[in-house]
Amino acid sequence: MCMSVQTKVAVLKWIHHLFINIPHKMFNHIENLFPILMKSLSDNSDEVVQQTLVVMAEIISSKSPEAAITDSNAEMQNKYFTKFIINLLRIFSADRHLLEERGAFIIRELCILLSAEDIYKTLAEILLEESNLSFARTMIQTLNVILLTSSELFDLRNKLKDLESLVSILYISCIFNYYFKLCILL
């Protein structure tokens, strides 16, 4: 069955609407929706990919109790955030063409919808464990280009430039510790 771009976008907007208005009911269906949404990231249409990211951002940033977990630092986190990033990296690893052609678009859109710092930190943590060094190197190069050239990451670049405060220094050492380790390894 082949759906038009408009139909796909309309379905994604409806799913987004449902997650906003009745998240407690929608989280009962997340295990079925998650793989379908991940597959939609490979769609040829930018509009479909963009709307898929809007839905995923709603899911992975939800404060709904169904999505919450407590990490080792006793902070509440959304359990789907890391799951999404891991699956995104798997998709990029399996489909290098998607990474090369759409990877920057997907990462930039995520940085608009969510915290760029959280995205980069989580990507770095996961890539540190990546056994395929060729993929890790390609992904790091992609992330570097995005960080250096993307207007969506202007605030993050400014934070990295401003090393005058203790908070900035701690930010660099904590957030990008994993990222720098990966760069050194490669």
Predicted feature locations:
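Core helices of alpha-solenoid repeat scaffolds
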Residues: 23-35, 77-86, 100, 116-120, ...
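Secondary-structure transition/capping motifs at alpha-helix termini
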Residues: 41-46, 62-67, 74-81
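Alpha-solenoid helical repeat scaffolds
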Residues: 1-30, 73-80, 92
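Long internal repeat-built scaffold domains in very large eukaryotic proteins
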Residues: 113, 117, 121-186
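Hydrophobic residues within the alpha-helices of tandem HEAT/HEAT-like
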Residues: 11-22, 37-42, 52-66, 88-92, ...
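Short inter-helical turns and helix N-cap capping residues of alpha-solenoid HEAT/ARM repeat scaffolds
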Residues: 3-4, 44-46, 95-96, 131-132
